């Protein structure tokens, strides 16, 4: 049976610049506990400004169940509900909601790179950045999932999220560990061409000159998460 990497990005904070570590801990603990019983490896992979991304390595037949459980947990612990309330069972009523990206796993361990963006006044140009990352992955033959869409996206087990969702997520699955540094370097280098975009550590708040966008890049490896910021910084010495 095919397996997939599913990433769900959401703002459940009560502010626009950072997340609550205690809430993150509660969400992560319950998601891991409930999904592990189904044989699904899941965790918070990215924390970018006021957004978190929950990433799962999940069999095709459990995608709907995976998403439903994550949505339940988010509603249980959320301090801010705007993104959650943007979800609708009616496609035409879906508003700014979750960011949803899915890509087929080509590794038995579910290895992938997850890139998450957060905006502060950069809503008008952030989609271009995410689509650029998507294009890099596809150009080099990787399977890519991207949350950017011109129309509402159906999230199995949850409902529809609107096209105006503005903190995109990109998932790129890889076959070999050696693909990680090559792909991460290409993404980092390519994104340098964008003005008002800042590469930050996983977990960083929005500490920029607005308007602008921040992004994090992590490796999701067999359910474990590695922040790629430190490795890229040491290699490139920026």
Swiss-Prot record:
Q: Which InterPro entries has this protein been placed in?
A: UCP005278
Similarity section: To M.thermoautotrophicum MTH564.
The protein's name in its UniProt record: Uncharacterized protein MJ1676
